A protein has these predicted regions:
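Nuclease catalytic cores that cleave nucleic-acid phosphodiester bonds
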Residues: 79-204
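Domain-level signal for Mg2+-assisted phosphodiester chemistry and nucleotide/NA-binding surfaces
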Residues: 1-102, 151, 155
Length: 204
């Protein structure tokens, strides 16, 4: 069997889903989705989900926390790797107004490190990359130099693609609406501790 490890760019996937479907399919079963993308003769080893914790918004924090807890309970092959948000000042050139925005940091670096490290440690035969971030191309090239026996396939989220990534990987595919629709977590997930986690009403 061909061992597959999946690497999910959380923000690339999130914004692709929102652009195409709004919040309708954010309660996504990542393990189920990746499994639906496998080909005959492939077996899923792990799903690594790269994201960053929301801060300074109580409602958003709870929705994200409930989702991650539901994933942990329902999808045992999923591991979450946290990046971070960094505050950055912005200034309007015309009126001089200033404001602060929060930018997600470290996700692409974390994916790059995991992709290369897992290849060197022989944790997969094929890497499935759910992202359209061309910043990952150098890591892909490094991985293939170090382990030319490994394959990498890009799975582009809705309304996301990259010509540079298409050139860097061995193959690519587009994640179809039917796969996303059929890969939703149960509306209610109950943890081993008896905690009830419901899909947020906001995600409809």
């Amino acid at each position: 069997m061909v061992r597959v490890a999946a690497y999910v760019d959380g923000f690339n996937l999130y914004f692709g889903l929102k652009a195409k479907h709004g919040r309708k399919y954010l309660w996504l079963d990542l393990q189920g989705l990746v499994t639906s993308l496998l080909r005959p003769g492939q077996t899923l080893q792990q799903v690594t989900y790269f994201t960053a914790r929301v801060r300074n918004d109580v409602d958003s924090e709870k929705r994200q926390s409930d989702y991650l807890d539901a994933l942990a309970e329902h999808s045992p092959l999923v591991t979450v790797v946290d990046g971070r948000f960094q505050e950055k000042g912005r200034r309007c050139r015309q009126c001089g107004t200033t404001w602060t925005v929060r930018e997600e940091k470290e996700t692409d670096v974390n994916i790059a490190v995991a992709l290369v490290e897992d290849a060197v440690q022989d944790r997969y035969d094929t890497a499935l990359l759910l992202s359209a971030d061309s910043d990952l191309c150098p890591a892909i090239r490094a991985m293939k130099r170090l382990r030319p026996d490994k394959r990498i396939v890009a799975a582009f989220p809705p309304r996301r693609q990259s010509g540079d990534l298409k050139q860097a990987v061995d193959a690519f595919l587009y994640i179809g609406d039917d796969k996303i629709r059929q890969s939703q977590l149960p509306l209610t997930v109950i943890t081993a501790a008896g905690i009830v986690l419901n899909r947020p009403k906001h995600w409809t």
